Amino acid sequence: MTYRDAGVDIDAGNALVERIKPLVKRSFRPEVMGGLGGFGALFDLSGKYKEPVLVSGTDGVGTKLKLAQQLGRHDTIGIDLVGMCVNDVLVQGAEPLFFLDYFATGKLDVDTAAAVVGGIARGCALSGCALIGGETAEMPDMYPPGEYDLAGFTVGAVEKSQLLDGAQVRDGDVLIGIASSGPHSNGYSLIRKIYERAGAPAEHVLDDGTKLIDALMAPTALYVKPVLALLKSHGQAIHAMAHITGGGLTENIIRVIPDGLGLDIDASAWTLPPVFAWLQREGAVADAEMWRTFNCGIGFVLIAAPAEAAALEQALDAQSLAHWRIGQVVPAHGDERVRID
């Protein structure tokens, strides 16, 4: 009996590595030392930072993965994986430096895995982050046929003096919300239930002319390059930032707000995108549940000094990023620190 007889095909794993090598190398930065295949990936941090603080993050894509597998859409789920990780470390002002992925399946399908890793490599390249390594695990009997799981890991760096930790946030600071590309990678257990119960055809078209399934599978927006540019040009104006992930607008912005302060968010400041309006209508989802589950069209938030907000908005306009003033920092309302009206 061989390892292949037991369900593990080493040749398929080697074929995958050869397939993805050119994709991965396109994401490399000058600081990457060596190539793929070593026991550890190497990255030279010297020369760029005086007092670097490393910022790490790890995440998955939740049950959006289930929908991707159901639809056979494997080429963009890797972008989601990158976005969930790099947008998180960006919150503290860090530049994502490198990324590693974990791909696990019961039986390795080289074409599927290559499509997934290709998306990861593309997301890394778009974020200026090197896909420096990863693990492909073929584990017979652990996953049903055709299914796989993903996890991502990233490390970024920021000068100690430029670290954003929320300590600078003050009463009266302005919240500037940057548009999301859709639900990103959160709320998909509820999304899948609504989608199944609604019985909507895959070709169903939303009010803006977008196919429903395209809106649901739109890759997570990558905020790294535009936000790093803002930090470089207007860094003193930005007191904190938030990535709107699980917990929605209700639970994410408040994570970077000091005790004693709260948030007033004006829901009329922007229009709920059609995909979220469809989900709320078809799922009979209450407003409070929408705010707590989905990003509702706001994927990233800048918390800025009010005197500098207009300059930040002009800089966002210059980058063609849709944005809105969605609220402000206020004294906390007792136990209710976040109000959305």
From Swiss-Prot:
Cited InterPro entries = PurM-like_C_dom, PurM-like_C_sf, PurM-like_N, PurM-like_N_sf, PurM_cligase
Which terms in the GO cellular component ontology are assigned? cytosol
Is Membrane given among the entry's keywords? no
Q: In which pathway does it act?
A: Purine metabolism; IMP biosynthesis via de novo pathway; 5-amino-1-(5-phospho-D-ribosyl)imidazole from N(2)-formyl-N(1)-(5-phospho-D-ribosyl)glycinamide: step 2/2
**Cystine crosslinks:** none
Q: What is its EC number?
A: 6.3.3.1
**Which Gene Ontology molecular-function terms are recorded?**
ATP binding; phosphoribosylamine-glycine ligase activity; phosphoribosylformylglycinamidine cyclo-ligase activity
Query: Enzyme class, one word?
Result: ligase
Write out the GO biological process terms. Answer: 'de novo' IMP biosynthetic process; adenine biosynthetic process
Q: What's the superkingdom here? A: Bacteria
Instruction: Spell out the subcellular localization from the entry.
Output: Cytoplasm
Which keywords has UniProt assigned to this entry? Answer: ATP-binding, Cytoplasm, Ligase, Nucleotide-binding, Purine biosynthesis
Pfam entry (one): AIRS_C
Q: Which reaction does it catalyse?
A: 2-formamido-N(1)-(5-O-phospho-beta-D-ribosyl)acetamidine + ATP = 5-amino-1-(5-phospho-beta-D-ribosyl)imidazole + ADP + phosphate + H(+)
The record ties this protein, via HAMAP family, to: AIRS
Q: Which NCBIfam families match?
A: purM
Question: Which family is this protein grouped under?
Answer: Belongs to the AIR synthase family.
Under which name does UniProt file this protein?
Phosphoribosylformylglycinamidine cyclo-ligase
